[in-house]
A protein has these predicted regions:
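Surface-exposed loop/linker segments characteristic of extracytoplasmic
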Residues: 40-346
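N-terminal single-pass transmembrane signal-anchor helix
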Residues: 4-44, 50
Length: 346
């Protein structure tokens, strides 16, 4: 009688199988990551489209696009900001106007009625965004304001701030963040424009203001460079962290920090697109122009994302584009200004 023996895998065969599986995983993982990032980038673009649409829906009701921010308005701006006047004040001083950013102002136009009711009533634009009546709503995460590609946790605690800031904004309060900012102006240094061979639009003129400007509702006709040629919103991801060239430059905001405006409701949620030098600082001298960094250089006041090769922007007409890191400085600065008069450049 013959005895039948079962032959199993030898150690070498098992190791070969494991090696093949490891190779397959190594080949498939980058593909999976690319698909995941493509989906995140598309979601990010859809968020910007919704925000752009909300701005235009408000324009249809109000007759102007929303202010990028309302804080410390000038005497010239005050007459157009009556809906932000604090109750019980005469409305004659800058301090009589509540502080808000465009994201708070467009809340009713992005179907966020539930957020407006968090404090037991409508979000009150006549009180500062951090006032007690608005704190519950301001402390609520809104997915439309967040890009899924951003690795930062989309919230931070006021406990990380200085004692003075905690006195102003409240202690132990968790603030949700936003990855999208309004572009309120372009570079305001004449030397930068003339070094690039462009006409200086005037450092204090309306020409360098963005589609959404500080302390004023923008009439569409004032965007003389064309809505489709001018940036309205852009990614400036991961604030309040200080990110430079893909790396964390400083830890979470603390002390007397300018990065508090990572909170989505913060009245400083607008950026001036200036371009930056290699250190991540604003361009201020002619020598900075040849080596200027344009996109994904720093998230402190510039266009910044965690997408490979560029960042998403929303134009004045509501269309969304992917701006490459290789965009020229000329194109970037002229696209940030609504009426500089210089022809579009690529």
């Amino acid at each position: 009688m013959f005895k039948i023996t079962r032959k199993g895998f030898t150690l070498i065969e098992l190791l070969v199988v494991i090696a093949i599986i490891a190779i397959l995983i190594g080949l498939l993982l980058p593909a999976v990551q690319k698909v995941r990032e493509a989906a995140a980038r598309m979601k990010c673009q859809n968020n910007l489209k919704n925000l752009g649409l909300a701005c235009h829906n408000l324009e249809g009701v109000r007759g102007g696009l929303p202010p990028s921010s309302v804080q410390s308005p000038s005497v010239i701006d005050i007459p157009g900001l009556k809906e932000f006047q604090k109750s019980g004040t005469t409305g004659t001083l800058a301090a009589h106007y509540a502080k808000h950013c465009f994201l708070s102002i467009i809340l009713p136009y992005i179907e966020q009625g539930n957020v407006l009711k968090q404090a037991g009533g409508a979000y009150d634009l006549t009180q500062d965004w951090y006032a007690a009546i608005n704190r519950s709503a301001s402390g609520t995460r809104i997915p439309t304001f967040e890009c899924p590609s951003t690795p930062f946790g989309h919230s931070f605690s006021t406990s990380s701030l200085s004692a003075a800031e905690q006195t102003t904004y409240g202690a132990g309060w968790t603030l949700p963040t936003a990855d999208y900012m309004a572009v309120n102006r372009s570079n305001n240094r004449a030397i930068i424009w003339t070094t690039m061979g462009l006409t200086d639009p005037g450092v204090n003129s309306d020409s360098i203001k963005g589609v959404l400007a500080s302390n004023q509702f923008t009439r569409l006709l004032s965007v003389t460079d064309g809505l489709s040629n001018t940036i309205m919103l852009a990614e400036a991801s991961a604030r309040p962290q200080d990110r430079r060239l893909g790396k964390l430059a400083n830890p979470l905001a603390g002390g007397a920090s300018p990065y508090m405006n990572g909170a989505w409701a913060h009245s400083g949620n607008d950026i001036a697109i200036d371009g930056s030098n290699a250190a991540g600082s604003t361009l201020s001298a002619a020598a900075d122009v040849p080596t200027a960094c344009r996109v994904n250089c720093t998230n402190q006041g510039e266009v910044y994302s965690f997408h490979s090769g560029g960042a998403n922007i929303c134009m004045g007409d509501g269309s969304v584009r992917f701006m490459s890191e290789s965009v020229s400085l000329k194109a970037l600065l002229t696209m940030a200004a609504r009426a500089d008069g210089n022809p579009p450049s690529e």
